[in-house]
Amino acid sequence: CCRLACGLGCHPCC
């Protein structure tokens, strides 16, 4: 995923 809440970048965190 690509979300600001997950940090600056795209990774499977959502």
Swiss-Prot record:
Protein's cellular compartments: Secreted
Q: Which domain of life is it from?
A: Eukaryota
A GO cellular component term found in this entry reads: extracellular region
Keywords on this record? Amidation, Disulfide bond, Hydroxylation, Secreted, Toxin
Q: Which residues carry this modification: 4-hydroxyproline?
A: P12
State one molecular function term (GO): toxin activity
Disulfide bridges in this chain: C1-C14, C2-C10, C6-C13
Q: Where, per the database record, does this protein carry Cysteine amide? A: C14
Q: What tissue specificity is annotated for this entry? A: Expressed by the venom duct.
Main localisation: secreted
Domain-related comment: The cysteine framework is III (CC-C-C-CC).
Q: What family classification does the UniProt entry report for this protein?
A: Belongs to the conotoxin M superfamily.
Supply the name of the protein. Answer: Conotoxin Ar1446
User: Which species does this protein come from?
Assistant: Conus araneosus
Species classification: Eukaryota, Metazoa, Spiralia, Lophotrochozoa, Mollusca
